[in-house]
Amino acid sequence: MTKQFSMELAGRTLMVEVGRVAAQANGAAFMHYGDTVVLSTATASEKPRDGIDFFPLSVEYEEKLYAVGKIPGGYLKREGKPSENAILTDRVIDRPMRPLFPKDYRNDVALNNLVMSVDPDCSPELTAMLGSAIATAISDIPFDGPTASTMVGLIDGEFVINPTSAQKEVSDLALTVASTREKVIMIEAGANEVPEDVMLEAIFKAHEVNQEIIKFIDTIVAECGKEKHDYEHHIVDPEMYDDMVAFITPEAMEEAVFTDDKQTREANIRAIEEKLEERYAENEEWLAQIGEAVYAFQKKTVRKMILKDHKRPDGRDIKQIRPLHAEVDCLPRVHGSALFQRGQTQVMTVTTLGSLSEAQRLDGIDVTETTKRYMHHYNFPSYSVGETRPSRGPGRREIGHGALAERALVPVLPSEEEFPYAIRTVSEIMESNGSTSQGSICASSLSLMAAGVPVKAPVAGISVGLVTGEGDDDYIILTDIQGLEDFFGDMDFKVAGTDKGITAIQMDIKIHGLTEQIIREAIARTKEAITHILHDVMNPVIPAARDHVGEFAPKISQYTIDPEKISEVIGKQGKTINGIIDETGVKIDIDESGRIDILSEDQAMIDKAISIIKSIVEPLNVGDIYEGEVVRIMNFGAFVQLSSNKDGMIHISKLSNERVEKVEDVVNIGDKVAVKVLEIDKMGRINLKLEEKIED
């Protein structure tokens, strides 16, 4: 039996159908927002997965090209691997949902979102976030929801709830906020240097809207919700845990984790595990639980140190940033490079400049964006954490971190008109102990400036963490969290920005939400840290972008022609443009508006190519002198090619002021000559006079 529920959301109708499709899933919501349609399902395995110490949640956001009336390309004509946008949407759906499942739940859970129709005015990503929350809430899967999500834009100083595609194009803010009944559980934002107080206002505006959505979801759950099923609770044997704590002692564990060197700490923990392996060698059941038990003991120890003793594992104050170092020009022949280090986290970013034709082409369901001029790629090799594993290409985490850094830097990049280059930055993680994504933002900002990209302002990033106690007021916020504080803490609140304001936020938490007080304090803390990094570390290295691109970067000049003359520049089967390229060695890109980009490391060759193009598209003026080549000789004169599409004739009487008996006495085929235009007759024929021969 199908049941329908609807509400007005930002001037459009959100309609949810339950029972119409996918009845065999644990929960299914057929979502309609405007003309956007997404099927969201939640399914769980009947039994827990053996041998794991984590909750196995998978989230899939599937973009079907039929949703926008397109047929996939390629030989198979089927959708291939997920797009970058789909992977990022998977992650943004996952983040508010994961903390609300029981921590000891080991059944496989899959949240699938099938995008079936796309209305550009109604975000399919937001629809999928709401759909996953509803499908899980009405299912029998244990879940402490519901959650609700809202997008906020900022146009001319006014907030816009769930902006349309057209509004997003002119918005200074792209904010997504997910909430529970009382608290904010997820924040993701890209912004054009939005001040901190405006960002906070937008976050809490979204939280208010989310409360109305949660009331709507409650009505659906009340009518369609299933009773949550019982499950096998996965816990470490209490007797084993108590024996371990008594044997190792809390003091010894605190001593093991209290060091500013990651490898020393890992060696200390491994030594503890070896002692336990020896102690429990005869008890297979306890032996199998050592890893989880030691992890839990570490976590309890670290959280107590921070919360009760205000002591961090590496000895820092709660507001103290790890030692910082920055430098530029690390690599000799690249277009731009920089190294940024924060404690034992080290990132090198390399910038490469290319023609706009090298921008990334996007083939997905977003028909408003078909190319991406700025690309940020993030690589996290195994050696950065002292491990050995084969490289299989970027995973979801690497794609997500790259996108976060990209989002943080896009607002300060120059326009195509100001800087007609495609730009790629690659962040190579050399060493990792937490906050590599924020390190890549700092390194990339430095690298861009070193490459001569005229950014509006340098950008820095920082991550703050959180350890909570029993009540809402019992917490400690940590500036610049290292890996251990990320693993055992409750929050990873990443913020990037300039002196002027915020350019990106990404908030991940492991608890059931944050109070307004914590969010305000966290953003204030990031502002302090960003100011310190910019002024005390980055600016002394390179305070602003260089006024020229690097020695080995291509130079670009632009020249605009009448679009109707594009065919003249290209020539039949590309003969003309290829001739220019062969003669000058430049790279030429022409777009349909008539803009021509000419690239080369040699400015003289760029100038020569422009001169040739001008000779093709610009009309000849009577009385002006032009250079050309003699291409044909007749008994009455010589024909001179002035450009690929223009030639004229020098009558034998105009070859010299003296009488000429034979044309070949003055010029021959292949001679370079300077000629004056005497006349362009009604038929377009060009009559010339020889001024001089040009010697090689």
Question: Where are the model-predicted features located?
Answer:
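Glycine-rich, flexible beta-strand/loop modules in the N-terminal catalytic cores of phosphate-handling
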Residues: 25-110, 115-117, 122, 188, ...
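Flexible, glycine/charged-enriched surface loops at secondary-structure junctions
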Residues: 103-109, 144-146, 213-231, 263-264, ...
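Extended amphipathic alpha-helical scaffolds
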Residues: 1-45, 53, 229-369, 554-568, ...
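Flexible glycine-/small-residue-rich
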Residues: 33, 42-44, 61-63, 113-117, ...
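Mobile "lid/hinge" segments at catalytic clefts and subdomain interfaces of large enzymes
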Residues: 142-257, 448-547
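Conserved phosphate/anionic-ligand binding catalytic regions in large, soluble enzymes, centered on
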Residues: 27-29, 122-140, 328-351, 433-453, ...
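Long, basic N-terminal domains or extensions that often function
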Residues: 1-232
